[in-house]
Amino acid sequence: MVPPVYIVSTARTPIGSFQGTLSSLTYSDLGAHAVKAALNKVPQIKPEDVDEIVFGGVLQANVGQAPARQVALKAGLTDKIVASTVNKVCASGLKAIIIGAQNIICGTSDIVVVGGAESMTNTPYYLPTARNGARFGDSTLIDGIQKDGLLDVYEQKLMGVAAEKCAADHGFTREQQDEFAIKSYQKAGNALKQGKFNQEIAPVTIKGVRGKPDVVVEKDEEIEKFNEAKLKSARAVFQKENGTVTGPNASKINDGAAALILVSEAKLKELGLKPLAKINGWGEAARNPIDFTIAPALAVPKAVKHAGLTLDQVDFFELNEAFSVVGLANAEICQIPLEKLNAYGGAVALGHPLGCSGARIVVTLLSVLIQEGGKIGCAGVCNGGGGASSIVIEKVDSDFKL
């Protein structure tokens, strides 16, 4: 029997818009804030108790050596902590959770901080010719966000081109994608108004400059930018003729971080910790890189099977909305009822900080299970290169006893 792994705390930053309210914060600033907030919820865990941190991060240029290590030390963890940074593109944060759980199961760690972060705003441009010297003519700047985050390296096509292929392959219209996006914004807006994100978001204080007061950021920045008329009239971005994917019906470029604290059963008993959820299983898969959009349709069933369940036993699903068509296509293939999917909206409305999102969807999934009466939840996220990662968690009841 596989030893259980428990989630005892979660936290995330609000998600900031590109060059928005969180733009002054670095990858490590964002990550450390989420980690501190998660640890503050479990005072029984002291900094010296944490064995390891596994943290996702995609756009690592100019971030500095060992980004996860920076997060750990900035969050106040000891210099003895083992730190690993994961780059599995959009699935990085979820892969970090899987690795943390595996290390606990293997007996090499008892308490692991996991999650991910991204400051897409602070990603630099590259000047490749500068290394050897530009001898003659113009030199071209390379956008780091596009090069390392949003471009299929094999076909040299943007991720949105793959989304257009997915829409064509599966027969999803522009109108269907717009409707999915509108519902994502509506669900996120309702969740915001009802305080559904309060237990997961740790407000961030941005220091005022030149005599200006500090600003407290406590909600996701994108949600309130929703304009249905503009969404429906937006031009297709990636395909001129008969294009269906637009800026508004796709995820956004964002900044943010999310963190979770995982513990073994032995450490749960020793410290008298109250678990929020148990990790029941996970699954990963890959296919042709240009079809990464539907890789979750392979990974999700594997995760559910690994957990010893069937898809109809899952109460709520979180699928990262890289594009509206990703949610639509994977839900159709896996026969997931849309009322079970992304109950509080998804990346279209909330934002998609690349290295953070895989962890963020698990944090939000747990919020949904707790507040909407669910027991079993499954999260899945596709990633550039053709892959996907998925995880199944089970909410622990308030009367839980070992």
Curated annotation (Swiss-Prot):
Domain of life: Eukaryota
UniProtKB keywords: Acyltransferase, Cytoplasm, Lipid biosynthesis, Lipid metabolism, Metal-binding, Potassium, Steroid biosynthesis, Transferase
GO biological process, one term: ergosterol biosynthetic process
Disulfide bond residue pairs: none
Binding site for K(+): Y185, A250, V348
Active-site residue numbers: C90, H352, C382
Coiled-coil spans in chain: none
Catalytic activity, EC: 2.3.1.9
Main localization, broad class: cytoplasm
Locations listed in the record: Cytoplasm, Cytosol
Annotated GO CC locations: cytosol; mitochondrion
Catalytic activity: 2 acetyl-CoA = acetoacetyl-CoA + CoA
UniProt induction comment: Expression is up-regulated in azole resistant clinical isolates. Expression is induced by exposure to arole antifungals such as fluconazole, ketoconazole or itraconazole.
Residues annotated as signal peptide: none
Enzyme's top EC category: transferase
One Gene Ontology molecular-function label: metal ion binding
Residues reported in the UniProt entry to bind CoA: Y185, K230, S251
CDD domains: thiolase
PROSITE patterns attached to this UniProt entry: THIOLASE_1, THIOLASE_2
Entry similarity comment: Belongs to the thiolase-like superfamily. Thiolase family.
NCBIfam families associated with the record: AcCoA-C-Actrans
Protein name: Acetyl-CoA acetyltransferase
